[in-house]
């Protein structure tokens, strides 16, 4: 009985540890991340627009792949 109690306690402790790691506590930076300059929340479209802008910039930086004569991408240049 003693061993099963210790095993149960160990499982509960590990479960609580994993649960606390899965949901980090929000800090002040997280609370103000989606707040606009006037103190209201930023619209979803603005957030998505910013994300698309940064994605486009990343795509332009990584757009140095090879293209054959017909204009098709060459997936693995030789």
Curated annotation (Swiss-Prot):
Question: Where does the secretion signal sit in this chain?
Answer: 1-22
Organism this protein belongs to: Conus bayani (Bayan's cone)
**Expressing tissues:** Expressed by the venom duct.
Phosphoprotein recorded as keyword: no
- Which residues in this protein are found as Pyrrolidone carboxylic acid? 62
Family, according to the entry, reads as follows:
Belongs to the conotoxin H superfamily.
Quote the biased-composition stretches of kind Polar residues, using this chain's numbering.
Answer: 34-43
**Ranges of compositional bias, category Basic and acidic residues:** 47-72
Q: What is its main location?
A: secreted
Name of this chain's protein: Conotoxin ba1890.8
| Keywords associated with the record | Pyrrolidone carboxylic acid, Secreted, Signal, Toxin
Residues of the propeptide: 23-61
Also noted in the record is: The mature peptide does not contain cysteine residue.
> Where is this protein found?
Secreted
What Gene Ontology cellular-component terms does the record carry?
A: extracellular region
Molecular function in Gene Ontology: toxin activity
């Amino acid at each position: 009985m003693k061993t099963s109690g210790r095993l149960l306690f160990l499982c509960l402790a590990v479960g609580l540890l994993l649960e606390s790691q899965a949901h980090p506590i929000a800090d002040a930076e997280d609370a103000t991340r989606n707040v606009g300059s006037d103190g209201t929340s930023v619209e979803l479209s603005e957030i998505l627009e910013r994300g698309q802008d940064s994605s486009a910039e990343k795509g332009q930086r990584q757009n140095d792949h090879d293209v054959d004569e017909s204009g098709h991408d060459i997936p693995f240049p030789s």
